[in-house]
């Protein structure tokens, strides 16, 4: 069942999702602006989805956006007349209201819901479009969209094209079924393929005035309730199978307890199915008669959704990390989110060009996924804050392969990256001398160039806050080993832009005196690399550093 069709149910007392996030520290004017813009965006999405059958955003992002709206409204006491289903409401009454379903937030919530219940069943939560199917004398005569649960749109014009749906029952029954129209998929594994926009395809087709037979043949039906059916779920499923609705029994399992529910949830998440799903439905065998059903979440059904494939995250700040070569990487600092089993508070945008393209500012809401199930990745900007906070962006012209050889406020990050590379395993391989140590030494004024550490004494180190006697001894030992590393390791550590297989010889002077033609003669060195090598070796800061290393009697200099 589509999540958007259940939104009004979440406003009922006791059904709102728990939200333990702190309230933003915003003045009233900004709070009103943020809520107003969020309402406009949601209204725009609702209108496109319900009138045109076009989903502008994934269901899970829509759901999280609704939750964020409720959070802000609760924080700032900003009630609204927002009606998510205003454009979904049709003119035709359902013979039996669609109840919707309450969502269980996490495993403890599922365990609490199951506690003490008997006769439980579990089914896949098919990701499609909810409908009522009205049969008269065994013939399908009316097809109604869920609408607002009470009034739906008449989609009966599509019945002749829906060849995969039972249009004539084997018995002349006058009855109503409720179910999900879904887009038929071959061997669809939800954990791997995600939703595949399956629900959006069906919603878009049904919003049309007319379907072709080919389009209609792609639509299947999963009957999930028979309001006037037998009293027990087992009997209902058996009779549904006899009537031709075989998937209902095929994908329904009687369970006892949480462990069984968790097993089937994982099984259907990772097993090939003929439709997309977004969780499982837990269903109690006993239920009241259909005359008492209302368009609200009932006590006898609940949904346990799959983990989000995308999470909505609010940007707290933007930091621009500058690497050793001057590459600028924007890092979004996020309000922490949970995605799968990971807590994420930072995500890289990869390049300055991508940040410029997306124009992300603090306060914006972005969609975050896990690339390869491990690496956080920004998929899109979902909501832009009406307050476009200024962002201080490093100038790419100030940071490049030959910039920042000394400590300064503008060069702090790139210079620290140079030190970390020099002492790392690609350079001098000084154990215990990482970014934190270099930061301490630079902040205390003990290191301002790439060679200053060669002059540090025990007394110098003990003057640095956070460095005691034992640590000072370990650092001196690491520095001593680093000093004695071979010439080639020093060159790699300083960032010589040569191919990995290049053998530099044993003398800096000979290396620095090479011309472009000599570099071009080296295997793997083209025109661009030759120019980089020439510029590196002739740069005044690099030459000054080489002279200092020669004064320290470093091998090769």
Swiss-Prot record:
InterPro entries associated with the record: DNA_ligase_B (IPR020923), DNA_ligase_CS (IPR033136), DNAligase_adenylation (IPR013839), DNAligase_N (IPR013840), NA-bd_OB-fold (IPR012340), NAD_dep_DNA_ligaseB (IPR050326), NAD_DNA_ligase_OB (IPR004150), RuvA_2-like (IPR010994)
Molecular function GO terms recorded: DNA ligase (NAD+) activity
GO biological process, one term: DNA repair
SMART domains: LIGANc
Keyword annotations of the record: DNA damage, DNA repair, DNA replication, Ligase, NAD
Entry keyword annotation includes DNA damage: yes
Pfam families per record: DNA_ligase_aden, DNA_ligase_OB
Bilayer-crossing regions: none
Functional description taken from the UniProt entry: Catalyzes the formation of phosphodiester linkages between 5'-phosphoryl and 3'-hydroxyl groups in double-stranded DNA using NAD as a coenzyme and as the energy source for the reaction.
UniProt similarity note: Belongs to the NAD-dependent DNA ligase family. LigB subfamily.
PANTHER family per record: DNA LIGASE (PTHR47810), DNA LIGASE B (PTHR47810:SF1)
Protein name: DNA ligase B
Source organism of this protein record: Pseudomonas entomophila (strain L48)
Taxonomic placement: Bacteria, Pseudomonadati, Pseudomonadota, Gammaproteobacteria, Pseudomonadales
Gene symbol of the encoding locus: ligB
